[in-house]
Amino acid sequence: MLLQVDRLITELKLPPNDAYFKLRHTLEAINDLISSCSTTVGGTQLVDPVAGNVCFASGAAGWSFTLQSFAHLYLKIHGIQFDHEKFASRLWGDLYFHPDSRTFKKKPPKEGANRSFVEFILEPLYKIYSLVVGEQKGNVESKLAELGVTLSNAAYKLNVRPLLRLACRSIFGTATGFTDMLVKHIPSVKDAAARKIDHIYTGPQDSSIVDAMKKCDPNGPLMVNVTKLYPKSDCSVFDAFGRVYSGTIQTGQTVRVLGEGYSPDDEEDMTVKEVTKLWVYQARYRVAISKAPAGSWVLIEGVDASIMKTATICPMNIDEDVYIFRPLRFNTLPVVKIAAEPLNPSELPKMVEGLRKISKSYPLAITKVEESGEHTILGTGELYLDSIMKDLRELYSEVEVKVCMMHFTTLSLFFWVN
């Protein structure tokens, strides 16, 4: 999703043609990054507006569209009987509309002609913004009427920002384009399970556990991959966020929590916990549930005590060996190190407890004690460490903490030199 497209109009004030080149350059940069980071697992899926996996949006103005949804809207407004998918395929790239023959060609009809994306999408969008910002009620009212939108007289008395948001939402409607993009390009949980399990499960692939996970079987053995810990409002304990790959997790259920160091030969990194509560996230809200079947993302209370980064949850009794889901992998390393100590030495235990919570909350943070007794924190960069220190001071330890000089680790210098 390309957000803040409206800033090309309101802040950068780019001409429509330049805005098109900016958007195209951004997508090319994204595809270059995808290609450079891609693995053999699942192949490489590049973003392309014609394919329908790019959504243009503005959070401030409350609109979003794909080429397909915009083409459908355009044909509906103008009463044209034509396949919107075919029309959408002609709205990107070096294609030009020839009004005489009413066809799209790679050759422009005249010198200086605009590409189809500029002519059919950007220019109307620019016109809407210029009319609303111009604060000429008559012009806005007549133009919106052409688009089949009627606003109340009270709406035209609003300030520019709320009026623009109301006008754009009335024109573009609900986020059907974004929803259609998700439905079309994101596979269902069951369809994606086999590829996912091959990639993240560390055990043998011919076991009955793997078979149940690949089928997303709600009646199979419980297997949950915990990937993130979220603090409670008082930051005293955490709730575990994970995906149920097989089985059904329920409140009151006793489970085994396997840490990142667990293996069937070494069961030291394992604890037994009871699931006390379950929720599903809906934006910033939590909805309490009693159970969650395979395929669900669920928030779990009561199992966080032994989890540091990620974990695997499995049932108490199972006939075969259970292996863990592999820990998360990142393209960056925590190479920037700072030393921290409490301003008041007597508050050291509080800071140490806060550092433990920081390690649980930040996936790429590493906290350790040096041989000198110094407490150090490693992060990916200055901004990352700033966020860590803010949370350490205000949420997790609630003590004054002073920081020694920041420096890069030997590992980072090695990468720079080479």
Residue locations for each model-derived region?
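Structural and coupling elements of P-loop NTPases
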Residues: 1-418
